[in-house]
Amino acid sequence: MNLLHRRYCRSDAWQRAVQHGMMPWVLRDVGLGDKVLEIGPGPGVTTDWLRERVPALTCVEIDHDLASSLKKRLDGTNVTVVEGDATRMSFPDASFRSAVCFTMLHHVPSRELQDGLLAETHRVLKPGGLFIGSDSTSSFRFRLFHVFDTCVSVEPDRFAAQIGRAHV
C-alpha cells in the first residue's frame, strides 16, 4: 500500500465505514461457523469486527510489519495471526468452516495469483464452506489511492469466470 492508502485504512472514517457499514451489510444473516479464516487483514479493522462475532479467527497476512503488529495487538484473544502467503497456506485441507476476504484481493499482483489465492482458499475450506468477501470496483478515486501501488481490479462482471479458472 502506498502512504495515502495506508493512512486511510487506519483512519477513523475507514473504521466507521467498515464496522458500521460494510461488515454488517456483507455478513447480514450469515453464520460463519466456529473456525474462520481471514485473508489479508491489513491493519485489522475487519479483524476487530470479526473477532467479536466468531469463536476462533485465523488471519493470514503477507506483510511482515502488519502481521507483527496484529500478532502483538491481538495476543491472548481468539485470533491467531499467521504471517504468510495466502496462495500457499500451510493449513491442512478442510480446516475452516468459512473464509473471508475484504477489500484486499486487488492488492494481489496478478490475476493468476488471485486465482491461486481463490483455489488455495477453496482447498482449506470444509466441504460446503463459505467464502465471503468484498472488494472495490475501479473508479478515479480508487485509482488515486493506488498510485505507485499494486492494483489489479476485481471486476464484478468477470469474477464468476475468475472463480471458474480457479476451479472453485
Task: Give the label of every model feature segment.
Residues 1-17:
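Class I SAM-dependent methyltransferase Rossmann-like catalytic core
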Residues 128-135:
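Conserved beta-strand signature within the Rossmann-like core of class I S-adenosyl-L-methionine
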Residues 115-127:
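A short glycine-rich, Lys/Arg-flanked "PGG" loop and its adjoining helix->strand segment in the class I
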Residues 15-34:
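Conserved alpha-helix/loop element of class I SAM-dependent methyltransferases that forms part
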Residues 100-101:
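A conserved beta-strand element that flanks and buttresses the S-adenosyl-L-methionine
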Residues 43-88:
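Class I SAM-dependent methyltransferase SAM/SAH-binding core
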Residues 166-168:
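Conserved small/polar residues in nucleotide/adenosyl-binding loops
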Residues 33-42:
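Conserved class I S-adenosyl-L-methionine
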